[in-house]
Swiss-Prot record:
Chain positions with Phosphoserine modification: 9, 417, 434, 517
GO molecular function: catalase activity; heme binding; metal ion binding
Active-site residues annotated for this sequence: 75, 148
InterPro entries: Catalase, Catalase_3, Catalase_AS, Catalase_clade1/3, Catalase_core, Catalase_haem_BS, Catalase_immune_responsive, Catalase_sf
UniProt feature, compositional bias: Basic and acidic residues: 1-22
Name the UniProt record assigns to this protein: Catalase
Binding site for NADP(+): 194, 201, 203, 213, 237, 303, 305
Residue numbers of N6-succinyllysine PTMs: 13, 221, 480
Species the sequence originates in: Sus scrofa (Pig)
Amino acid sequence: MADNRDPASDQMKHWKEQRAAQKPDILTTGSGNPIGDKLNILTAGPRGPLLVQDVVFTDEMAHFDRERIPERVVHAKGAGAFGYFEVTHDITRFSKAKVFEHVGKRTPIAVRFSTVAGESGSADTVRDPRGFAVKFYTEDGNWDLVGNNTPIFFIRDAILFPSFIHSQKRNPQTHLKDPDMVWDFWSLRPESLHQVSFLFSDRGIPDGHRHMNGYGSHTFKLVNEKGEAVYCKFHYKTDQGIKNLSVEDAARLPQEDPDYGIRDLFNAIATGNYPSWTFYIQVMTFQEAEAFPFNPFDLTKVWPHSEYPLIPVGKLVLNRNPVNYFAEVEQMAFDPSNMPPGIEPSPDKMLQGRLFGYPDTHRHRLGANYLQIPVNCPFRARVANYQRDGPMCFQDNQGGAPNYYPNSFSAPEQTHSALEHCTRYSGDVQRFNSANEDNVTQVRTFYLNVLNEEERKRLCENIAGHLKDAQLFIQKKAVKNFSDVHPDYGARIQALLDKYNAEXPENAVHTYVQAGSHLAAREKANL
């Protein structure tokens, strides 16, 4: 209703009210030249052709033609906000990172929430993992904690990531989401069982972005002032309480408000209802890692809280909406390799792959100088290096300072305090197959002990409701994997699939032939 609008709907009204005492700015071209007429093109006579000297038109049109930048290959649809991280508990015994320097310290942060597989115009309420990335602007440079709303992931080896994402995206011929592709990949990679079970549980469709937890997911390394190191995992638990959408509400909202999550976050912050999350770590010593019953760097598994309890660290608070979405959210770029001294990577194979993949895609999407974009700029540190030039270099390019190292002219020098922790590794160099590294034990615990009976029922209904659209041989492979977790898990899904399959005509397998095939016309007619 026009008389009962939320802050997001009234953004234009509020912008005008904030400038009520000001005169409108004079309209200009991109180069700052005043414009006398923005409504009528320059032509030779009222019915004549336009003139190429109409720079008002060409300036506007040329910029319009270049407004769009490449969409993120994953996490394209997102919401962003800004705030601070405040330390509430001392963990300097574990890490020398300045972000944890003392209780009460506040560090500015930027956060981006997102879905994974959908395009930038897709709905916020799909069943999909949610990205939950946090950028800490520290005095030692930016720290990007590029997490999700799940503590686990579908795969444990980074070489599978492109194929996994392709399977979740659109079919290369039909350009449709394809259940065959989705479930074929999942069924062939049973390490996905844990994340698939989480995804199809009630938490698979969070109620907006404020009511879900966040996780760094990977295993990281913390290093203290003495050079002592431990492994750790990061958790951020919502202070608003966990809330999820029902399947029915999630199906209704894309028609009514496909941007439900963005709107909810914007309105909460605009009305002073600032969302917050409590930040925790789990810690594991190197000795404990050696004796751990499974690979502690396996992204498809969690560390049991009973053995590695959550240690409180601080609070994440979001108290500012973006001033401009494109400038501060679309151009925001997170890079897991942005780690200040005191925080380092572990041998987690997925993390190792992301250390390269993320900055590489940012350079493609935003350009070689993407770290000069204000939202990505480490504004609390002084950038001093030997990198120069490149497209869209809009700072001073470090003036006349030497652009080579080493040099004899008092240019930036390395600092011993930033040296990485010394870690010893040994073993044969080869491609190790991790496909069969106990893919079911933790999933069984999740199914039997974490979920109650009603949640198990909904989980199986959600899985069957999606799996029913895949071919029968793929259904069979998937059900076997669920049965390996627990016979009841597979049996429930199979019973539901039997009902679906009895109602629908028998699955047909279609064969597609490339143009120029040497098949005889008669053979083609039988396809």
